[in-house]
Amino acid sequence: MAKLLQPPPKFLPSEWHIANKNQYHRADAQRSRSERLVAESQRLVDEIEKTTRKSQSDVNKKLEQRLEEVQFWKKELDDKLEQLVNVTDDLLIYKIRLEKALETLKEPLHITETCLAYREKRIGIDLVHDTVEHELIKEAEIIQGIMALLTRTLEEASEQIRMNRSAKYNLEKDLKDKFVALTIDDICFSLNNNSPNIRYSENAVRIEPNSVSLEDWLDFSSTNVEKADKQRNNSLMLKALVDRILSQTANDLRKQCDVVDTAFKNGLKDTKDARDKLADHLAKVMEEIASQEKNITALEKAILDQEGPAKVAHTRLETRTHRPNVELCRDVAQYRLMKEVQEITHNVARLKETLAQAQAELKGLHRRQLALQEEIQVKENTIYIDEVLCMQMRKSIPLRDGEDHGVWAGGLRPDAVC
């Protein structure tokens, strides 16, 4: 216990001075290190603050550039969308024009086919494959060809409208995404260090697995623009094609209509001329019938007129047979009476032969009269079919519209049918 209570060892003055100096040196060294650290820390703080400001400024510029780039593509898409919508609206109008043109063609085709059916009711020799029938068949073929062409063009227009709507959908979807992207980037661009809604986000520094590269992004929008341009150009070409088709087909059909009408007029003229000539011949035959009937009457009278002289001659001859004895002489009178009877008999035979010929000729004239009357009826039937039924009906074919230089009732232009 006494050992534990021993006083601490005493140091020498030199040791005391050395210990103090050591403390001074360590304090100076510690302070120097601290001062250097403070200075280094300040430089680090300044450097990082400067770097952060520069980085944030650079990010702001990049966001601003991105906003401008997205805005540029959004405007491009907006312009293409507007153009595509306008040309699609035009195509819808053209589609209606094609539909109306097809509907309008039904009447001319019906009229042409009806004319052909009517003309099948011609009779006799008039049931001929003439120029009118040839041109009517050609007109029907032209109309059917035009309808087939318009139907194909209508299908092309419908398909083009579908393609336009598909491109429009892609543009609208791209525009919608870009609008959202612009909104998001605009919010990001407006953020600053004093914004109230800034916060730390867990795992913010990451690449989304479904993200695309800038090149892919540019290709996507560029492809949408190119597709829209392609469909717009296709639509413009289709519009020009429809205009040409409607113009050319209407012009072709109008020309054929004129050809058919001219054929009808020429055919009617020929038929009427033939009818008039037949009527002239009928009139002459009727005159000849009347003349022949008078001739027959005269011949019959002449034959009847021979009965008196014949009876007289016969009576004289028979009476002279009663002369007595030698008076029953073959004298000159007897021979002359016999010759008279022979002459009368011969003349009556000649008259009867001529009468038979006249009666046969009269029958022939009556047969010719009936044939001419029947043929005139054939011509009248043809004239009625062509002039009354066909040509009157053809007047209802849609005509040229003077104000629009040939607009069809159904919208076909620039030339109408007839």
From Swiss-Prot:
Description of post-translational modifications: Ubiquitinated, leading to its degradation. Deubiquitinated by USP16, promoting its stability.
Stretches assigned to coiled coil: 21-107, 134-177, 266-308, 333-384
InterPro entries named among the record's database cross-references: Tektin-like (IPR048256), Tektins (IPR000435)
Tissue: Predominantly expressed in testis. Expressed in airway epithelial cells.
Keyword vocabulary terms for this entry: Cell projection, Cilium, Coiled coil, Cytoplasm, Cytoskeleton, Flagellum, Microtubule, Ubl conjugation
Compartment(s) of residence: Cytoplasm, Cytoskeleton, Cilium axoneme; Cytoplasm, Cytoskeleton, Flagellum axoneme
Highest taxon in the source lineage: Eukaryota
Entry similarity comment: Belongs to the tektin family.
Subunit structure: Microtubule inner protein component of sperm flagellar doublet microtubules.
Protein's job: Microtubule inner protein (MIP) part of the dynein-decorated doublet microtubules (DMTs) in cilia and flagellar axoneme. Forms filamentous polymers in the walls of ciliary and flagellar microtubules.
Protein name as catalogued: Tektin-1
Taxonomic source organism: Homo sapiens
Gene name per UniProt: TEKT1
